[in-house]
Amino acid sequence: MTVARLTDAERDALLAELPEWALREDGLAIVRTFRFADFSQAWGFMNRVALHAEKTDHHPEWFNVYNRVEVTLTTHDADGLSARDADMARAMESFL
Protein backbone atom coordinates (compact mmCIF):
# COMPACT_ATOMS: atom_id res chain seq x y z
CA MET A 1 0.00 0.00 0.00
CA THR A 2 1.38 3.39 -0.97
CA VAL A 3 1.00 6.19 1.53
CA ALA A 4 1.43 9.83 0.49
CA ARG A 5 4.42 11.61 1.93
CA LEU A 6 3.81 15.00 3.56
CA THR A 7 4.83 17.99 1.48
CA ASP A 8 7.40 20.38 2.93
CA ALA A 9 4.59 22.85 3.69
CA GLU A 10 2.53 20.16 5.47
CA ARG A 11 5.59 19.05 7.45
CA ASP A 12 6.38 22.63 8.47
CA ALA A 13 2.76 23.22 9.54
CA LEU A 14 2.86 20.04 11.64
CA LEU A 15 6.05 21.13 13.40
CA ALA A 16 4.54 24.56 14.07
CA GLU A 17 1.45 22.87 15.55
CA LEU A 18 3.54 20.51 17.69
CA PRO A 19 6.50 22.57 18.93
CA GLU A 20 7.82 19.81 21.23
CA TRP A 21 8.51 17.65 18.19
CA ALA A 22 11.61 18.10 16.00
CA LEU A 23 12.52 17.02 12.52
CA ARG A 24 15.13 14.27 12.49
CA GLU A 25 18.38 15.28 10.84
CA ASP A 26 17.62 13.35 7.62
CA GLY A 27 14.18 15.01 7.34
CA LEU A 28 12.37 11.67 7.14
CA ALA A 29 10.98 11.48 10.68
CA ILE A 30 9.89 13.52 13.67
CA VAL A 31 11.25 12.89 17.16
CA ARG A 32 10.34 13.78 20.71
CA THR A 33 11.46 12.85 24.19
CA PHE A 34 8.70 12.58 26.79
CA ARG A 35 9.59 12.81 30.49
CA PHE A 36 7.34 11.61 33.28
CA ALA A 37 7.44 11.65 37.08
CA ASP A 38 8.41 7.98 37.26
CA PHE A 39 8.51 4.67 35.43
CA SER A 40 4.85 3.85 36.12
CA GLN A 41 3.69 7.03 34.40
CA ALA A 42 6.01 6.42 31.45
CA TRP A 43 4.76 2.85 31.12
CA GLY A 44 1.13 3.97 31.36
CA PHE A 45 1.72 6.43 28.53
CA MET A 46 3.33 3.69 26.45
CA ASN A 47 0.33 1.41 27.08
CA ARG A 48 -2.10 4.09 25.87
CA VAL A 49 0.02 4.69 22.77
CA ALA A 50 0.32 0.94 22.12
CA LEU A 51 -3.46 0.48 22.15
CA HIS A 52 -3.87 3.40 19.74
CA ALA A 53 -1.07 2.06 17.52
CA GLU A 54 -2.74 -1.33 17.26
CA LYS A 55 -6.09 0.27 16.44
CA THR A 56 -4.59 2.46 13.70
CA ASP A 57 -1.96 -0.07 12.52
CA HIS A 58 0.78 2.55 12.79
CA HIS A 59 3.53 1.88 15.31
CA PRO A 60 6.16 4.24 16.74
CA GLU A 61 9.82 3.49 17.09
CA TRP A 62 10.57 4.12 20.74
CA PHE A 63 13.01 3.64 23.56
CA ASN A 64 12.27 3.75 27.28
CA VAL A 65 14.54 4.19 30.29
CA TYR A 66 12.85 4.79 33.64
CA ASN A 67 10.83 8.01 33.25
CA ARG A 68 11.93 8.86 29.70
CA VAL A 69 10.32 7.73 26.43
CA GLU A 70 12.11 8.66 23.21
CA VAL A 71 9.87 8.46 20.14
CA THR A 72 10.56 8.49 16.41
CA LEU A 73 7.68 8.64 13.94
CA THR A 74 8.07 7.86 10.25
CA THR A 75 6.10 5.95 7.63
CA HIS A 76 8.15 3.35 5.81
CA ASP A 77 5.56 3.02 3.01
CA ALA A 78 5.93 6.76 2.34
CA ASP A 79 9.72 6.77 2.77
CA GLY A 80 9.26 9.67 5.17
CA LEU A 81 6.55 11.52 7.04
CA SER A 82 2.88 10.96 6.32
CA ALA A 83 -0.47 11.98 7.75
CA ARG A 84 -0.29 8.80 9.83
CA ASP A 85 2.71 10.22 11.70
CA ALA A 86 0.91 13.52 12.22
CA ASP A 87 -2.12 11.69 13.62
CA MET A 88 0.05 9.56 15.92
CA ALA A 89 1.95 12.59 17.24
CA ARG A 90 -1.34 14.37 17.97
CA ALA A 91 -2.68 11.28 19.71
CA MET A 92 0.46 11.02 21.84
CA GLU A 93 0.06 14.63 22.90
CA SER A 94 -3.55 13.95 23.87
CA PHE A 95 -2.45 11.06 26.12
CA LEU A 96 -0.35 13.33 28.35
Swiss-Prot record:
Gene3D superfamilies, per database record: Transcriptional coactivator/pterin dehydratase
PANTHER family found in the cross-reference section: PTERIN-4-ALPHA-CARBINOLAMINE DEHYDRATASE
Catalytic reactions on record: (4aS,6R)-4a-hydroxy-L-erythro-5,6,7,8-tetrahydrobiopterin = (6R)-L-erythro-6,7-dihydrobiopterin + H2O
Coiled coil: none
MF terms (GO), sorted A to Z: 4-alpha-hydroxytetrahydrobiopterin dehydratase activity
CDD domains found in the cross-reference section: PCD_DCoH_subfamily_b
Biological processes, Gene Ontology terms: tetrahydrobiopterin biosynthetic process
Keywords per UniProt: Lyase
UniProt-recorded name of the protein: Putative pterin-4-alpha-carbinolamine dehydratase
Top EC category: lyase
InterPro entries (alphabetical): PCD_sf, Pterin_deHydtase
SUPFAM superfamilies the UniProt entry points to: PCD-like (SSF55248)
HAMAP family assigned to the protein according to its UniProt record, in alphabetical order: Pterin_4_alpha (MF_00434)
UniProt record similarity statement: Belongs to the pterin-4-alpha-carbinolamine dehydratase family.
Source taxon at top rank: Bacteria
Lineage: Bacteria, Pseudomonadati, Pseudomonadota, Alphaproteobacteria, Sphingomonadales
EC number(s) recorded for this UniProt protein: 4.2.1.96
